[in-house]
């Protein structure tokens, strides 16, 4: 059952990470926003009429920091996808095929995914020094957002990275010895009995 729960968590984290990667809402100003792969702009006061552009390749991205961040974040997402698929196969495979004594290589793959995503998330704010970001976020510089503010896409990516790193931990399952606790009918409180 634990493998099934980990597989479900891995698949949901993969989906959430994918959504945050394609989100254009990592840094946002009053009339535009951008993410790792997408940029959107809109007329002031009319945020429902957005025009969005996707960076087609690494060549289209404005700076080296942007390219490094995109490559490491996408690599982390691919590793997370692989680990989720491995865990799903592990959970759905017949028990007679192999003994389920561990999780195989998935903790290592998940740890590599978490490290890759961490590197990408730490490098991404350096994109604020690019001419593209300076045009959107007036007064921005490396690790200073200027007129922009962090938005939900970047926060979701950080949360996904933290949850992925927690997924690596194999929680120790302990068996609790059950004992009857006597109750007093007068006070209706538990009486502690030393062993």
Curated annotation (Swiss-Prot):
Main localization (coarse): membrane
Localisation: Membrane
Keywords, in A-Z order: Membrane, Transmembrane, Transmembrane helix
Domain of life: Eukaryota
Membrane-topology descriptor: Multi-pass membrane protein
One cellular component term from this protein's GO annotations in UniProt: membrane
The keyword Transmembrane is annotated on this UniProt entry: yes
Listed transmembrane segments: 7-27, 73-93, 108-128, 149-169
Keyword Transmembrane helix appears in the UniProt entry: yes
Alphabetical list of InterPro entries matching this protein: LHFPL (IPR019372)
Family: Belongs to the TMEM211 family.
PANTHER family associated with the record: LHFPL TETRASPAN SUBFAMILY MEMBER 7 PROTEIN, LIPOMA HMGIC FUSION PARTNER-LIKE PROTEIN
The protein's name in its UniProt record: LHFPL tetraspan subfamily member 7 protein
Organism: Mus musculus
């Amino acid at each position: 059952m634990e493998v099934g729960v980990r597989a479900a968590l891995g698949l949901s984290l993969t989906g959430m990470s994918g959504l945050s990667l394609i989100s254009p809402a990592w840094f946002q100003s009053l009339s535009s926003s951008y993410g790792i792969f997408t940029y959107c702009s809109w007329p002031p006061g009319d945020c429902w009429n957005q025009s969005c552009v996707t960076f087609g390749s690494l060549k289209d991205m404005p700076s080296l920091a942007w390219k490094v961040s995109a490559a490491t974040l996408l690599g982390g997402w691919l590793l997370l996808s692989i680990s989720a698929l491995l865990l799903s196969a592990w959970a759905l495979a017949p028990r007679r095929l192999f003994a389920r004594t561990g999780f195989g290589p998935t903790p290592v793959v998940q740890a590599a995914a978490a490290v890759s995503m961490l590197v990408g998330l730490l490098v991404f704010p350096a994109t604020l020094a690019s001419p593209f970001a300076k045009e959107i976020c007036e007064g921005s510089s490396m690790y200073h957002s200027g007129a922009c503010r962090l938005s939900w896409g970047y926060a979701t990516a950080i949360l996904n990275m933290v949850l992925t790193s927690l997924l690596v931990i194999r929680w120790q399952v302990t068996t609790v010895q059950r004992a009857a606790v006597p109750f007093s009918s007068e006070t209706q409180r538990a009486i502690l009995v030393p062993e």
